[in-house]
């Protein structure tokens, strides 16, 4: 894990929670105090949980399990997409479609249709259609892309979920819980940390804070995958020695 410091957390505004009247009492153990009717998050606890959950994500992905990044509110969309793409994770940065996980077979049909349209465009078949048909299919493609851009290569359910703002992404979290998929989530002072397996207390509204969290988790995924790579290299070397 990159050397994330208290200073880095402070500069990103990770310590700023919500207005005190909007708090969830279950977040009390992560709150340091209040200032101007705003709850202040205990950054020592944030740092502790961030380091712990980095190891959780690294260890999960080192076994070959896939992870899905979820963050659909405005501040989270770009960091979620950028960091998921960087580490090769699935992601949902637009609206979460109900049944994405719990009705996975239906989702796979939508993915198949999306890929069919993409193939039509790549092979030139699309240009052979009438203007009216092209317009209809293009509208369908745009709609599917908005929902499936980060899921088009997902052939099976992910083994882990990372969420920015557990309060906002309740539907995704409930689906993951139903399927017993572990959840790592950034929880602000208005969230219920009991709904997720691995809460990270922190500001889930400030763009810099969200970017920091997404970057750390993506780094953990990449480290986990590098462990797989090293294990495979060792197997190849062992096989070569046996052949000799």
Swiss-Prot record:
InterPro entries: Ribosomal_uS2 (IPR001865), Ribosomal_uS2_bac/mit/plastid (IPR005706), Ribosomal_uS2_CS (IPR018130), Ribosomal_uS2_flav_dom_sf (IPR023591). It comes from the Bacteria. Pfam families: Ribosomal_S2. Keywords: Ribonucleoprotein, Ribosomal protein. GO terms for molecular function: structural constituent of ribosome. GO terms for biological process: translation. One of its GO terms (cellular component) is cytosolic small ribosomal subunit. Belongs to the universal ribosomal protein uS2 family. HAMAP family: Ribosomal_uS2_B (MF_00291_B). This is Small ribosomal subunit protein uS2. The gene is rpsB.
């Amino acid at each position: 894990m990159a050397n994330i410091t208290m200073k880095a957390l402070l500069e990103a505004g990770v310590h700023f929670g919500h207005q005190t009247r909007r708090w969830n009492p279950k977040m009390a153990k992560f709150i340091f105090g209040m200032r101007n009717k705003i709850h202040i998050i205990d950054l020592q606890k944030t740092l502790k949980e961030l380091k712990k959950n980095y190891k959780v994500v690294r260890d999960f992905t080192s076994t070959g399990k896939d992870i899905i990044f979820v963050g659909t509110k405005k501040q989270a969309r770009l960091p979620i997409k950028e960091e998921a793409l960087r580490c090769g994770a699935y992601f949902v940065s637009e609206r979460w479609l109900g049944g994405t996980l719990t009705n996975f077979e239906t989702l796979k049909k939508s993915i198949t249709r999306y890929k069919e349209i993409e193939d039509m465009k790549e092979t030139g078949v699309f240009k052979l259609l009438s203007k009216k048909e092209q317009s209809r299919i293009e509208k369908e493609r745009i709609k599917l892309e908005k929902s499936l851009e980060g899921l088009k290569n997902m052939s099976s359910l992910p083994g882990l979920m990372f969420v920015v703002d557990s309060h906002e992404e309740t539907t995704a979290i409930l689906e993951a819980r139903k399927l017993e998929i572990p959840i790592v989530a950034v929880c602000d002072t208005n969230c219920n940390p009991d709904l997720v397996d691995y809460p990270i207390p922190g500001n889930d509204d400030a763009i810099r804070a969200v970017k920091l969290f997404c970057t750390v988790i993506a780094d953990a995924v990449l480290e986990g995958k590098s462990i797989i790579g090293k294990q495979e290299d060792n197997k190849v070397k062992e096989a070569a020695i046996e052949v000799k």
